[in-house]
């Protein structure tokens, strides 16, 4: 039974700029099982993450290069990406 999981998290656009970081590997507790739970956990990580995640109204996510909903399950070693919705013009 797992106690923690390692997830690589990539940030794009405004999130990357706000965090001054394009990727990090995080060790998450066993209570964090989905994309949405990871987003909430990252938001609570520290003041910088909270400011970055709350400044973007809707954050899209991908897991291992595939668009994912908040309910998508995570597994050890997954690569997630968070980014604002793409706007065209």
Each model region followed by its residue ranges:
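Ubiquitin-like/PB1-type beta-grasp interaction modules and other compact soluble beta-rich domains
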Residues: 1-88
